[in-house]
Amino acid sequence: MVAKILDGKQIAKDYRQGLKDQVEALQAEGYTPKLSVILVGNDGASQSYVNSKKKAAEKIGMISEIVHLDESTSEADVLNELKRLNEDDSVSGILVQVPLPDQVSEQKVLESINPAKDVDGFHPENIGKLYIDQQTFVPCTPLGIMELLNHADIDLEGKDAVVIGRSHIVGQPVSKLLLQKNASVTILHSRTKDMKRYLKNADIIVSAVGRPGLVTKEDVKEGAVVIDVGNTPDENGKLKGDIEYDEVKEVAGAITPVPGGVGPMTITMVLNNTLIAEKMRRGIE
């Protein structure tokens, strides 16, 4: 068996065209979605990622700005900048690029974002709504994973899904989204004993721990769907996933590559959530 490759680049491209059409329809009514990103410091990876978001937003007709603050910026000044964006009626969505410098509390900053502009879906109010099945902003990587599965017409009902990783960014929210689709979900983590026992029985595997080569061909049953969220750079700067891609694709039914799988969908869902935020505050269905 040769796995179906879930090409996140192409799926994201198609999805963004639909978003572009919706942005144009909004503009015809006099509204243009605006995404504001706060970046504190000069971390190279963060700068690259923020620039990718800005470019992607502008490509579909949105306005995007990067509020770049110095590495030494105090927590109070970051919160003041956030307050300004919360109150700015031209801003549809806000996200704060993490990690933040040590002097700035990530939790305090994320809790200070207006929940109606929280396009990353990390505000406690939005996380809470997700867990009681209310409409809310969903974290972008889990949402992107679900769109990949949906695009590939993968039926999740009654399937055994294993999620490796329990972070609030990916592992826990994607587990909740899989539950909403009536999958039976098991979460594995660093204290799990005999991880392979769970993997071998899984119909769906989502790995999001940043450990290259964690999942091998021997761990995966034939026909399983394998989603790789890992993106760890090796000594040459090449991104490696958690899955041994070349060997696992020989047995999997479908698999995401790294890079080019989940990553493009994450940025696309930032745009999706920004569009939703603009529609919600304008009372547009």
UniProtKB/Swiss-Prot annotation:
Belongs to the tetrahydrofolate dehydrogenase/cyclohydrolase family. SUPFAM superfamilies: Aminoacid dehydrogenase-like, N-terminal domain (SSF53223), NAD(P)-binding Rossmann-fold domains (SSF51735). PROSITE patterns: THF_DHG_CYH_2. Keywords: Amino-acid biosynthesis, Histidine biosynthesis, Hydrolase, Methionine biosynthesis, Multifunctional enzyme, NADP, One-carbon metabolism, Oxidoreductase, Purine biosynthesis. GO terms for cellular component: cytosol. GO terms for biological process: L-histidine biosynthetic process; methionine biosynthetic process; purine nucleotide biosynthetic process; tetrahydrofolate interconversion. The gene is folD. Catalyzes the oxidation of 5,10-methylenetetrahydrofolate to 5,10-methenyltetrahydrofolate and then the hydrolysis of 5,10-methenyltetrahydrofolate to 10-formyltetrahydrofolate. NADP(+) binds at residues 165-167, 190. It catalyses: (6R)-5,10-methylene-5,6,7,8-tetrahydrofolate + NADP(+) = (6R)-5,10-methenyltetrahydrofolate + NADPH; (6R)-5,10-methenyltetrahydrofolate + H2O = (6R)-10-formyltetrahydrofolate + H(+). GO terms for molecular function: methenyltetrahydrofolate cyclohydrolase activity; methylenetetrahydrofolate dehydrogenase (NADP+) activity. This is Bifunctional protein FolD.
